[in-house]
Amino acid sequence: MGHLGFLVMIMVGVMASSVSGYGGGWINAHATFYGGGDASGTMGGACGYGNLYSQGYGTSTAALSTALFNNGLSCGSCFEIRCENDGKWCLPGSIVVTATNFCPPNNALANNNGGWCNPPLEHFDLAQPVFQRIAQYRAGIVPVSYRRVPCRRRGGIRFTINGHSYFNLVLITNVGGAGDVHSAAIKGSRTVWQAMSRNWGQNWQSNSYLNGQALSFKVTTSDGRTVVSFNAAPAGWSYGQTFAGGQFR
């Protein structure tokens, strides 16, 4: 990890406790699993996180159905899930997972017979190891209840700079609090703040020429809270590098 940017926290709008689902009741859904016993099949994914082990998410991850995925804006959000109302297959306790992928609909199958991720169903396709913490493998699919919870991360928000001159594609990972980045901005040491556009997943794009400048980042999550990481990347940064900034507390 590179230079740790100075953190400024700005509280905008509502607090984390009032994010959709925070502090509310449990919501009914269903869960299946994918990716194999080592979760190798969960790497990559529609959020753009790549290797989930090296990014710190591990096997506590989920692919979300259309109803939950929010066109990628739910990437990075955290859910507590427990198996419900199935004494044969459910195990006690709950899990907390991070949304890292999309479970696409299969309109060729009925919603109650294989089309688990079809709209309007709320469905979690869990990494197999974490599924087996709340249900037996042989169950295949189980009824669950879930709620949004704050994400707890170690270290700062991470910014991986990809692309090339005039096309800066920044992958934002390891976001605490609400976890789901809804807007981002970037500032070079010789520029003003510039809004970034979301390219896909949690890859955010700037078309400015920022080479040779220290980079600051502004990240806002769905609850309206913002973290500003000043000079997170030093002037000598290179494409492909990852730098750590501030963090939601």
From Swiss-Prot:
Tissue localization of expression: Most highly expressed in the young leaf petiole and midrib, in trichomes and at the base of the pedicel.
Entry-linked SMART domains: DPBB_1
Membrane is among the record's keywords: yes
Domain Expansin-like EG45: 44-156
One Pfam family linked to the record: Expansin_C
Compartments, as annotated in UniProt: Secreted, Cell wall; Membrane
GO biological process: anatomical structure morphogenesis; plant-type cell wall loosening
Major subcellular site: secreted
Keywords on record: Cell wall, Cell wall biogenesis/degradation, Membrane, Secreted, Signal
Domain Expansin-like CBD: 166-245
Any one GO CC term of the record: extracellular region
Signal peptide residues on this chain, from the entry's feature table: 1-21
Membrane topology, as annotated: Peripheral membrane protein
Cited InterPro entries: Expan_Lol_pI, Expansin, Expansin/allergen_DPBB_dom, Expansin_CBD, Expansin_CBD_sf, RlpA-like_DPBB, RlpA-like_sf
Functional summary from the UniProt entry: Causes loosening and extension of plant cell walls by disrupting non-covalent bonding between cellulose microfibrils and matrix glucans. No enzymatic activity has been found. Plays a major role in control of leaf growth and influences the mechanical breakage behavior of the pedicel.
Family as reported in the entry's similarity comment: Belongs to the expansin family. Expansin A subfamily.
Protein name, per record: Expansin-A10
Organism of derivation: Arabidopsis thaliana
